[in-house]
C-alpha cells in the first residue's frame, strides 16, 4: 500500500515536471516568435516610402561596423523571377545604393537568364545597365538603343514605393522558425489573391499563374540588430523543378563602402 502511494506520488511529480517544462518551452518559443515578428516589423514599417529620396534622411540600425562620421547607405532591391515550362529562368530587377553621405544614388538594372545545357550543367548570362536617381526618377547613365527596355527602366517602381504592410501580426497561422546556429530566422504566410500587395504585384507584372502566393520573410544575423545581417521578403507563386515564379524585395542599411 505504501509502495503504491509512493509510485503514484512519483508518477505525479514526473508528470508535473513534464508539464512545467512544456509550458516553459512554449513560453520561450512564443517569446522568440514575438521577437522575430518585432524584428521584421522594423523593416516592414518602411513600406510604403513613395519618394526614394526620403531615404537620405532615414536612419537605420548602426553598430561598430560603421566608421565614425559615416551616415550609411541604404541598399534597395526589387526583382521578379519567372521560369515556366520549357523556358529559361529570367529575372529582371533593379538595385539602388542610396548614399546618405553624398546624398547621391546609383545602381543597376539587371537582367539575368539561367538554363541547363544538354549535359545538365547550369548556365547563365547577365546584363547590367547602370542608372542613377535624381528627383525620385530612375535615369540610365549610358545610351540604351532598345526603346522598350529604356522605358522599362525609367518607369521602374520599387516595391517599397507601393507595398504596404500594416502589421505582420495581421497575418495569421504563420510558420515561424529560428536557427540559433547561423543565426537565421523566417516567417511564412499563405496569402490570398485579394491581399493588397498581391494585387499591386499583379497590376505591375505579367504573372503567368492565378495561384495565390506565400509570403516568406527571411533574415540572418543578431535578432537585436546587425549591419552584417540581411533581410528580404519573397512572394512565392510557384516553386518546383519545372516552374518558378516569385518576387523578391529587400531593404538593408549598411556601412558605406
From Swiss-Prot:
The membrane topology term of the UniProt record is: Lipid-anchor
Keywords of this protein's UniProt record, alphabetized? Cell membrane, Lipoprotein, Membrane, Palmitate, Signal
Q: Where is the lipid attached (N-palmitoyl cysteine)?
A: 23
Position of the signal peptide: 1-22
Lipid attachment site numbers (S-diacylglycerol cysteine): 23
The main location class comes to membrane
State if Mitochondrion is listed as a keyword.
Answer: no
Q: Which residues are in coiled coils? A: none
Give its localization: Cell membrane
Q: Which GO terms describe its cellular component?
A: plasma membrane
The Swiss-Prot or TrEMBL record describes its family as follows: Belongs to the staphylococcal tandem lipoprotein family.
Protein name, please? Uncharacterized lipoprotein SA2275
Amino acid at each position: 500500500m505504501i509502495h503504491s502511494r509512493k509510485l503514484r506520488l512519483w508518477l505525479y511529480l514526473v508528470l508535473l515536471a513534464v508539464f512545467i517544462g512544456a509550458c516553459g518551452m512554449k513560453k520561450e518559443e512564443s517569446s522568440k516568435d514575438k521577437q522575430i515578428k518585432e524584428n521584421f516589423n522594423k523593416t516592414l514599417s518602411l513600406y510604403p516610402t513613395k519618394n526614394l529620396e526620403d531615404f537620405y534622411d532615414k536612419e537605420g540600425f548602426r553598430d561598430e561596423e560603421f566608421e565614425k562620421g559615416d551616415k550609411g547607405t541604404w541598399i534597395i532591391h526589387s526583382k521578379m523571377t519567372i521560369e515556366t515550362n520549357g523556358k529559361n529562368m529570367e529575372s529582371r530587377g533593379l538595385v539602388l545604393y542610396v548614399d546618405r553621405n553624398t546624398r547621391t544614388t546609383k545602381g543597376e538594372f539587371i537582367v539575368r537568364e539561367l538554363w541547363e545545357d544538354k549535359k545538365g550543367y547550369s548556365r547563365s548570362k547577365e546584363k547590367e545597365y547602370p542608372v542613377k536617381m535624381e528627383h525620385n526618377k530612375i535615369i540610365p547613365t549610358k545610351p540604351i538603343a532598345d526603346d522598350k527596355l529604356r522605358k522599362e527602366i525609367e518607369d521602374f517602381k520599387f516595391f517599397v514605393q507601393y507595398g504596404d504592410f500594416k502589421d505582420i501580426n495581421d497575418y495569421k497561422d504563420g510558420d515561424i522558425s529560428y536557427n540559433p546556429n547561423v543565426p537565421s530566422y523566417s516567417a511564412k504566410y499563405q496569402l490570398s489573391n485579394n491581399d493588397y500587395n498581391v494585387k499591386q504585384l499583379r497590376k505591375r507584372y505579367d504573372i503567368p499563374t492565378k495561384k495565390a502566393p506565400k509570403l516568406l520573410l527571411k533574415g540572418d544575423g543578431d535578432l537585436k540588430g546587425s549591419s552584417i545581417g540581411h533581410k528580404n521578403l519573397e512572394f512565392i507563386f510557384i516553386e518546383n523543378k519545372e516552374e518558378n515564379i516569385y518576387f523578391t524585395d529587400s531593404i538593408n542599411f549598411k556601412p558605406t563602402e
